[in-house]
From Swiss-Prot:
Function: Catalyzes the conversion of heme O to heme A by two successive hydroxylations of the methyl group at C8. The first hydroxylation forms heme I, the second hydroxylation results in an unstable dihydroxymethyl group, which spontaneously dehydrates, resulting in the formyl group of heme A.
SS bonds (residue pairs): C35-C42, C189-C195
GO cellular component term, pick one: plasma membrane
Comment block on domains: The N-half (TM1-TM4) and C-half (TM5-TM8) domains are connected by an intracellular loop. Each domain is formed from four-helix bundles and they align in a pseudo twofold symmetry manner. The N-half domain is the substrate-heme O binding domain and the C-half domain is the cofactor heme B binding domain.
Cofactor: heme b
Subunit field text: Interacts with CtaB.
Binding site for heme b: H213, H275
Organism whose genome encodes this protein: Bacillus anthracis
Keyword RNA-binding: no
Biological process according to GO: heme A biosynthetic process
The name this protein goes by in its record: Heme A synthase
Residue ranges that the UniProt entry lists as topological domain Extracellular: 28-62, 113-121, 181-211, 265-271
Stretches of the chain found on the membrane's Cytoplasmic side: 1-6, 84-91, 143-159, 233-243, 293-311
Catalytic machinery residues: E58
């Protein structure tokens, strides 16, 4: 059974990633109304008779979201039953399921009542939490923490501050990026790093949205760089923290490069999807570090208790 659960966890994680990228594809191609204002049917039909490209993209996104719902539900039930001895399992199972349901409801609401940019940005943010929760659940199922000796990990307050702070801030940056996409402001500023050669400062709403996202992205790049330097200096003996921050920096660097290429490739579809891919992976890695941070206090108490008993 455990072998089956591991395969299920991997497939579910990949399915949710496809859902995230599919949502970005729907937005990029303007396929949000590919099935009209009909939900769960498509243009009022179970199998639409007229299949335009927009309809195929939107319908595919709905089907992958539906399959993700089934897989996440099954994974939550089985992990709850067979991995309940791991402290975070129940919490992650609940988060995975609740946020997936919320994601589906937000998606349905966007179809039926109109696609407001702010609502669509929230839709992506909710999807990201569900994806990260399933990734963490998968890590627990594969016992990644045991392989890196993470169960005895103890962090200082400074490192935990950076982990929690960067993760929360990353989530806010995600919303600014989603707002750029849904406000169709990706090309509002045709130059980089300034908005335009002729107008270095933004003058209209779409330009402010774009430049605000760039500023937020620059700050998270610097913050992760600083946290990585701390990890390299002080956590070489804790590989999960050491490599966690190095991987985070690699991902945020790739994210920044792709973000710049979005501007210079006229917002090509490939760059837009890679932009969504890298931020999803970065957020999942940061959430794993958060989970380790929550364990650190418990580990410190257990270490202190063991030390007293030894004396």
């Amino acid at each position: 059974m455990q072998r089956f659960i591991k395969w299920l966890a991997v497939i579910t994680s990949l399915d949710l990633l496809i859902v995230l990228l599919g949502g970005a594809l729907v937005t990029k191609t303007g396929s949000g109304q590919g099935c009209g204002k009909s939900w769960p049917l498509c243009n009022g039909e179970f199998v639409p008779s007229n299949l335009s490209m927009e309809t195929i993209i939107e319908l595919s996104h709905r089907l992958t979201s539906g399959s993700a719902g089934i897989l996440v539900t099954l994974l939550c039930i089985l992990s709850w039953k067979y991995y309940k001895h791991v402290r975070e399992t129940k919490t992650l199972a609940i988060l995975s399921f609740v946020f997936l349901v919320a994601q589906a409801l937000m998606g349905a609401a966007a179809v039926v009542w109109g696609q407001m940019p702010a609502v669509l940005a929230i839709h992506f943010g909710i999807s990201l939490i569900s994806f990260a929760s399933v990734i963490l659940l998968t890590c627990l199922i594969f016992e990644i923490d045991q392989k890196f000796d993470a169960r005895s990990l103890i962090m200082d307050k400074k490192m935990k501050f950076h982990i929690y702070g960067v993760t929360i801030y990353c989530y806010l940056v995600v919303y600014t990026g989603a707002l750029v996409r849904h406000e169709r402001a990706s090309l509002a500023c045709p130059d980089f790093p300034l908005c335009s050669k002729n107008r270095p400062m933004p003058t209209q709403l779409h330009e402010w949205v774009q430049m605000g996202h760039r500023l937020a992205a620059m700050l998270i790049f610097v913050w992760i760089l600083y946290a990585m330097i701390l990890a390299i200096r002080h956590y070489k003996q804790q590989p999960v923290v050491y490599w966690g921050w190095i991987i985070s920096f690699i991902l945020v660097t790739l994210q920044a490069i792709v973000g710049i290429l979005v501007v210079f490739t006229n917002a090509s579809l490939a760059m837009a999807l890679l932009h969504s891919l890298f931020i999803s992976c970065l957020f999942a890695v940061l959430c794993y570090l958060v989970m380790l941070g929550t364990r650190s206090k418990v580990n410190a108490k257990e270490a202190a208790s063991t030390s007293k008993q030894t004396k």
